[in-house]
């Protein structure tokens, strides 16, 4: 029992904001027409007693004037203020510096703050379970230490974006997919966008009116993509012999979706 109030199974969520940003930006760019995703953070944090969010404001780029810089960081300042206003949420800011065009921005202090806070809450027995959202392999020693201390550690990581050593270190793990993020979106935003429509069929519903326009071939699967009247359908034959069908009106978004859902959660090298 963690609290004197008698609360059982206290769960804290620790979020690497840079990792979460990268995940959301990827889906925005590849699947939702570059629209700014509207996240209901209370949905994201459902089931957790406290949420700790760590990030930093973007560094000013070389040659960037102050007005442009202030306009560029406004959305992140707005996000930080929004998160601070939510019950259970706590925001901690590190610093960043712009190194050069090739290496881009370097984030400082955030990783250390996450490590210190997770270990502190664990050693004080403030929580029974810690969940860390990250894809950074540098956190493996922290997870190892917490597990060895008896803390139950779960890892949330972007699908295909985390090293298997990091994933294997946690007691449990969850790959963050487009379906995960869809569950976090606000109801209003869901009305503005759509995912491919899924259907299972025992027969191939493709006739001569459809034109094959592409195929996606990987080591473990092959998907054929057809078009008719600006509507696209991707056909995946299962090992049972039936067909998984995915329909969408945007070819690039459909192809990204197919590769995303059929890729392994984590890449392992033999």
What are these regions (language model features)?
Residues 1-270:
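Terminal and domain-boundary accessory regions
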């Amino acid at each position: 029992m963690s609290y004197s109030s008698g609360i059982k199974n206290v769960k804290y969520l620790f979020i690497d904001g840079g990792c979460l940003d990268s995940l959301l930006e990827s889906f925005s760019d590849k699947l939702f027409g570059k629209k700014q995703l509207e996240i209901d953070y209370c949905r994201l944090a459902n089931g957790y007693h406290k949420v700790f969010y760590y990030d930093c404001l973007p560094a000013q780029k070389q040659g960037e004037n102050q007005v442009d810089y202030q306009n560029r960081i406004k959305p992140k300042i707005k996000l930080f203020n929004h998160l601070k206003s939510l019950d259970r949420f706590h925001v901690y800011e590190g610093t960043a510096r712009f190194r050069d065009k090739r290496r881009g921005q370097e984030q400082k202090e955030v990783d250390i703050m996450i490590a210190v806070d997770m270990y502190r809450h664990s050693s004080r027995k403030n929580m029974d379970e810690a969940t860390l959202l990250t894809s950074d392999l540098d956190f493996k020693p922290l997870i190892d230490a917490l597990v060895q201390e008896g803390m139950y550690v779960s890892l949330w990581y972007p699908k295909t974006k985390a090293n298997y050593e990091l994933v294997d270190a946690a007691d449990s793990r969850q790959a963050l997919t487009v379906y995960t993020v869809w569950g976090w979106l606000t109801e209003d935003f869901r009305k503005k966008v759509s995912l491919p429509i899924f259907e299972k069929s025992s027969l191939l519903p493709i006739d001569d009116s459809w034109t094959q326009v592409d195929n996606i071939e990987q080591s473990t699967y092959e998907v054929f993509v057809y078009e008719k009247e600006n509507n696209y359908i991707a056909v995946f034959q299962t090992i049972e012999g039936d067909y998984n069908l995915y329909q969408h009106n945007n070819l690039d978004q459909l192809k990204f979706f197919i590769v995303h859902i059929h890729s392994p959660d984590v890449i392992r090298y033999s």
